[in-house]
């Protein structure tokens, strides 16, 4: 009975009400808005804070905050697409295991997801790259990828390889990302790292994404590889609050 408690916005983090149709139950119980902490089917908008939150309007009632991986990827993709253009790209997220995985080998319709999260690197599907097209419509259908779940408890890593629309260099790519991280638009959302750090160093980092300039590669002028770290729990939680406010 949200109305009895004066609840304005429900942060839907159960994973059970991830479509607009299901999330409407919160509105029926008196809430005014619902923000889904996952990709949301038929949501009024899919938002990555700092990238397209300007699409929000007062009449929207059910909004998706996308996924933690989309929140890592989109702040990297947006400035690069603006500056040098992205024709097509493929992403891999090296992702810490989560609580929907199993700790011992069990039965599962997905045979890889049936395996112990603590014993293997587990390739699995993700819609994070494709979801960038909901945030940046000009890239709809141009990005794809998969995830590899690994036996670490927190912090994940996006590896994006793309074909640029023009020739570029490592130095230019890093300069674009450094400027983006310092911009009013992405300050606090996108970080920039040029030190030889590892995943644990980004635990409790509030950024959605921290670009790693030490790993940027360019081959033949137009084939570009970039990487970014993200605390898939803490950073995403901060963006839920930013979007809600």
Short names for language-model regions:
Residues 1, 85-88, 93-224:
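C-terminal substrate-binding/catalytic lobe of Rossmann-fold NAD(P)-dependent oxidoreductases
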Residues 1-114, 218, 240-242:
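N-terminal Rossmann-like NAD(P) cofactor-binding subdomain of oxidoreductases
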Residues 62-63, 220-231:
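Short FAD-binding loop at a beta-strand-to-alpha-helix junction that anchors the flavin cofactor
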Residues 71, 167-168, 234-235:
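A generic structural signal for alpha-helix starts
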Residues 149-153, 229-236:
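Glycine-rich phosphate/pyrophosphate-binding beta-alpha loops
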Residues 194, 231-232, 244:
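Conserved, well-structured ligand/cofactor-binding cores
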